[in-house]
């Protein structure tokens, strides 16, 4: 059985919990997820099974879309509401809608982000959250991220009693972006403490939340022999790649890992198909000669079965 399960991860579960439960439901070991979601975050979590586990890296590197909420007026150790409050500053008046929109827009494009201490990023073989819990000092790595969308959703809400303001947003971003940290950085630009107070992943790996299934729905489909109705073929991952249909001679060469020439092509990566399915990714080896070399092989890919 091969394919991608468009799973909706519920809150209170880790991504690895989901993998474990899918293994039990499907009675198979070859299962992997394509991008960690924190326990307090729900939304799209593509689960790869069988041959599709070979495309986990491609899914991980895809862009993501989130919707969530930022609260101005307090900050925590974890940059969300799970941590201990480390700073509070009451707002005497609300930040204007125009100022919020302007500040959100300032994040668009490429920038450098430092991941939060309570994160799974590894430094010298240890997760940052291990350093944080042990109280050990560590220099966090800088990451280049790209924000493609950061828009206000609805109207901001101001609570005069608590001196806090909340607003919802939608954000499109590159792999490895921490929305928690975006929330903190947003507040910093306004001279205010801030936290991410809610988050849902709407899209990952080209999979929208509306097409996802819960673990309970997956189990029901498995019991009823209807998994094929849920599984997304491995080929879905490469929808945006330029595709080349191979003839029999080229296919024979692919099987032997031979370099191939595609005179009309200039793309960095080509998705090569045979009998209607992606069989390999080839990467440019010599641009002037239009020569391509093997990059990723999916020779056993037959779609979902």
Curated annotation (Swiss-Prot):
This is tRNA pseudouridine synthase B. It catalyses: uridine(55) in tRNA = pseudouridine(55) in tRNA. The keyword Isomerase applies. One of its GO terms (biological process) is mRNA pseudouridine synthesis. Responsible for synthesis of pseudouridine from uracil-55 in the psi GC loop of transfer RNAs. Keywords: Isomerase, tRNA processing. The gene is truB. Pfam families: TruB_C_2, TruB_N. GO terms for molecular function: RNA binding; tRNA pseudouridine(55) synthase activity. Belongs to the pseudouridine synthase TruB family. Type 1 subfamily. It is an enzyme of class 5 (isomerase). SUPFAM superfamilies: Pseudouridine synthase. It comes from the Bacteria. The active site is at residue 38. Its EC number is 5.4.99.25. InterPro entries: PsdUridine_synth_cat_dom_sf (IPR020103), PsdUridine_synth_N (IPR002501), tRNA_psdUridine_synth_TruB (IPR014780), TruB_C (IPR032819). Signal peptide: none annotated.
């Amino acid at each position: 059985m091969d394919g991608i399960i468009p799973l909706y991860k519920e809150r209170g579960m880790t991504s690895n919990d989901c993998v474990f439960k899918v293994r039990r439901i499907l009675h198979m070991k070859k299962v992997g997820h394509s991008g960690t979601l924190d326990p307090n975050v729900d939304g799209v979590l593509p689960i790869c099974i069988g041959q599709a586990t070979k495309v986990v890296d491609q899914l991980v590197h895809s862009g993501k879309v989130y919707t969530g909420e930022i609260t101005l007026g307090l900050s925590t150790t974890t940059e969300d509401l799970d941590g201990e409050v480390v700073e509070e500053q009451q707002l005497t008046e609300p930040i204007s809608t125009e100022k919020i929109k302007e500040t959100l827009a300032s994040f668009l494009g490429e920038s450098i982000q430092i991941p939060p201490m309570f994160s799974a990023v590894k430094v010298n073989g240890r997760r940052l959250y291990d350093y944080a819990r042990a109280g050990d000092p560590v220099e966090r790595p800088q990451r280049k991220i790209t924000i493609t969308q950061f828009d206000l959703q609805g109207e901001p809400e101001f609570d005069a009693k608590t001196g806090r303001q909340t607003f919802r947003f939608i954000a499109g971003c590159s792999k490895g972006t921490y929305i928690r940290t975006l929330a903190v950085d947003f507040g910093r630009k306004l001279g205010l403490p801030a936290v991410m107070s809610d988050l849902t992943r709407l899209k990952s790996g080209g999979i929208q939340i509306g097409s996802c299934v819960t673990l309970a729905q997956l189990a029901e489909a498995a019991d009823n022999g209807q998994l094929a109705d849920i599984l997304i073929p491995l080929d879905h991952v490469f929808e945006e790649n330029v595709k080349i249909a191979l003839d029999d001679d080229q296919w024979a060469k692919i099987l032997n890992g031979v370099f191939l020439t595609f005179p009309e092509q200039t793309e960095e990566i080509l998705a090569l198909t045979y009998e209607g399915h992606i069989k390999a990714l080839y990467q440019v080896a010599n641009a002037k000669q239009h020569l391509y070399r093997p990059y990723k092989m999916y020779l056993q890919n037959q779609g979902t079965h």
